[in-house]
A protein has these predicted regions:
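Short, solvent-exposed loop/turn elements at domain surfaces
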Residues: 58-59, 81-83, 225-226
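N-terminal secretory signal peptides
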Residues: 1-10, 14, 18-25
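C-terminal cap/substrate-recognition subdomain and adjoining C-terminal extension
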Residues: 32-36, 50, 54, 69, ...
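Signal peptide processing junction and immediate N-terminal pro/mature segment
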Residues: 26-31
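Short, solvent-exposed loop/turn and secondary-structure capping segments
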Residues: 83-86, 91-94, 203-204, 278
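Asp-based phosphoryl-transfer active-site loop
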Residues: 70-84, 276
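A metal-dependent, Asp-based hydrolase signature
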Residues: 86, 91-170, 174
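Mature N-terminal segment immediately following signal peptide/propeptide cleavage
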Residues: 34-76
C-alpha cells in the first residue's frame, strides 16, 4: 500500500538524506576517536605531544601556527633508530673497511685502520675524533655520490644488527613513526636533522621514515663537480669534512637548509641540546623532547656513562628548560614495528 504524504518526491528524498546524515553523525560521535599514538602509554610525554599539536593547529587561538611555518625536526641515531652498540654508519664503515682491506692489504699498515679491521673498538675510540674521521674518509670518499648511495643501499639490504639479527632499517622506533605520521597529517614539515652523514641517511630516509631526501640535514663530506670524458657529470666525494651537523652545528644546519626554527624538536643525546634550545627559546608554543634509553630488556639502557649517545647535560638541563624526557621503558608500549 502506498500512502500519499502530500510532499513532493524531491522533498521526501531530501528529508531522508538529512535523517541518514544525522544518524551517521550520531554514530560517529558515539565511537571513541582513534588514538593517533597507539604505541604510547597515556602519560606526560604523550599528552605534551598531543597538546602541542592541538594548540598550534587550532585557528583563531593565541598559539596557532600557520601550516607554512610548522616545522618538526628529529635527530636520527638513538631518536628514530637503534644506535647501540655502535652508530649504524660506523658499523657500515668498518664492514666496508674490511672489504677494502681484502683488496688492498696496505690499508692495515695504518694503526687506526688496523684496529678497526681487527675489531679493536677500544683502540678505535682511543683515537678520538681524528681516528674516526680517518676511517670515515677512507671508506666514504673516492667515488661519486651516486656510487656511494648504491653502496649504502646494498649494505643496508644485507647487514644485520649484532644483537637483534634484524636489518637496521627494521630497528626503527614505532612510537616515533606514529609521531611523524601525526605531525604530517597536521600540516607539519617533518625533517631529519642528524649528526650522521647526510648522504648516508638520505639513502634510506624515504622508504624507512617517509622523509624525502631533500628533508634530511646532516654532516656533509666535501664534494667536487666533475665532467666525465663521455660528457656526463658527477659529484665526486673527497676525503674531507665540510660541515658537522652536531651540537651547535645543528641550529646552523637548520638555518641553512630549513630557514625556520622548529616548533617541535626531538633528540636523545647531548648533541641535540642546541637544537632543542634553538626550538624552545623562540616565542610561541614550542616543545623539545629527549628520548631516554632506559629499557635494557627491549632495547638498551644508557645515558650519562656511554660514548655512544651520551645524555648527561641534557638530563640536567631538561627540567629548567621545560623539555620533556620520554622514558622508553615507561612511555612506549612497543619499541619496534611488528613486535
Amino acid at each position: 500500500m502506498i500512502f500519499d504524504t502530500g510532499l513532493p518526491s524531491l522533498t521526501r528524498r531530501m528529508l531522508a538524506a538529512t535523517a541518514l546524515a544525522l544518524a551517521a553523525t550520531r554514530a560517529a560521535e558515539a565511537q571513541p576517536a582513534r588514538d593517533p599514538l597507539p604505541s604510547w602509554r597515556d602519560g606526560a610525554a604523550k599528552r605534551a605531544i598531543l597538546d602541542l599539536v592541538r594548540r598550534t593547529t587550532r585557528e583563531r587561538t593565541p598559539d596557532f601556527v600557520p601550516p607554512a611555518q610548522r616545522v618538526a625536526t628529529f635527530d636520527n641515531d638513538g631518536t628514530l633508530w637503534v644506535e647501540q652498540p655502535l652508530y649504524t654508519q660506523f658499523i657500515f664503515a668498518i664492514d666496508r673497511l674490511k672489504e677494502m682491506a681484502a683488496r688492498d692489504p696496505s690499508l692495515a699498515e695504518r694503526p687506526i685502520l688496523k684496529a678497526a679491521i681487527d675489531g679493536d673498538m677500544r683502540a678505535v675510540m682511543a683515537g678520538g675524533e681524528r681516528g674516526l674521521a680517518e676511517i670515515i674518509a677512507v671508506t666514504h670518499a673516492g667515488m661519486s655520490q651516486d656510487a656511494f648511495n648504491g653502496i649504502v643501499t646494498q649494505w643496508l639490504g644485507t647487514a644485520r644488527h649484532p644483537r637483534f639479527n634484524r636489518p637496521f632499517t627494521q630497528l626503527i622506533y614505532q612510537p616515533m613513526l606514529e609521531v611523524m605520521r601525526l605531525l604530517r597529517r597536521e600540516g607539519f614539515a617533518v625533517w631529519i636533522v642528524t649528526g650522521g652523514g647526510q648522504e648516508f641517511v638520505r639513502a634510506f630516509s624515504q622508504p624507512t621514515y617517509g622523509v624525502a631526501l631533500d628533508r634530511v640535514v646532516g654532516s656533509i663530506g666535501k664534494t667536487e663537480f666533475r665532467l666525465l670524458p663521455d660528457g656526463k657529470s658527477e659529484l665526486y666525494r673527497l676525503p674531507a669534512i665540510e660541515a658537522v651537523d652536531d651540537g651547535p652545528g645543528k641550529p646552523v644546519g637548520i638555518g641553512r637548509f630549513i630557514g625556520r626554527r622548529p616548533t617541535i624538536a626531538f633528540g636523545n643525546s647531548d648533541g641535540d641540546i642546541e637544537m632543542l634550545q634553538f626550538a624552545t627559546t623562540s616565542p610561541g608554543a614550542r616543545l623539545g623532547l629527549f628520548v631516554h634509553h632506559d629499557d635494557a630488556v627491549r632495547e638498551y639502557a644508557y645515558d650519562r656513562d656511554t660514548h655512544i649517545g651520551r645524555l648527561d647535560r641534557g638530563l640536567t638541563l631538561a627540567p629548567a628548560a621545560g623539555w620533556t624526557v620520554i622514558s622508553m621503558k615507561n612511555d612506549w608500549l612497543k619499541i619496534f614495528p611488528g613486535g
